[in-house]
Amino acid sequence: DYAASVNANLFVSIHLNSGGGHGAEVYYPNSNYRSDIGSEGKTLAQSVQDELIALGIYSRGIKIRNSQDSKYPDGSTQDYYAVIQRSKRAGFPGIIIEHAFIDSTNDFSAFLNSDEKLERLGKADATGILKYLGIGKGEWKQENNGWRYQYTSGEFAINKWEYIDGFWYFFDGNGYRQT
């Protein structure tokens, strides 16, 4: 409810797993009721999972978990996890990131036993989220009419100020640098 009250675009719940396994997994919304949110959630989950796997964590995959008895307003099977179903009802994807198993000696020693290792997990999460949102480092493109800045999403900075590499730049309605 809080995420919806502040007009969130997504909800991310950070967890450590336990129970005798190893590796990372990310839960995302099912495709029932608001399939668009299920699709967006799947893309977000995969983006985060890809970054975690790049750290060397075993991939348990991206997953959905359906409720055994609850239904969405359209009568379809509801998501099991409350943060995912409430995010979906509010109109944005919610995911649960299970980083590693705290009761796995290997996961603990490789990914959880220092601030530096925990920071790497956090940065992987952030990078995956930024890539999903199309935010992040882009690159300058020189064209006949001047310079443009292209984001990693492929879109250009248009009609806005942008802070890039320590400097502010303004881009006109066609995406050309003015300052």
Give the predicted meaning of each segment:
Residues 136-179:
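Extracellular adhesion/carbohydrate-binding repeat motifs centered on closely spaced tryptophans
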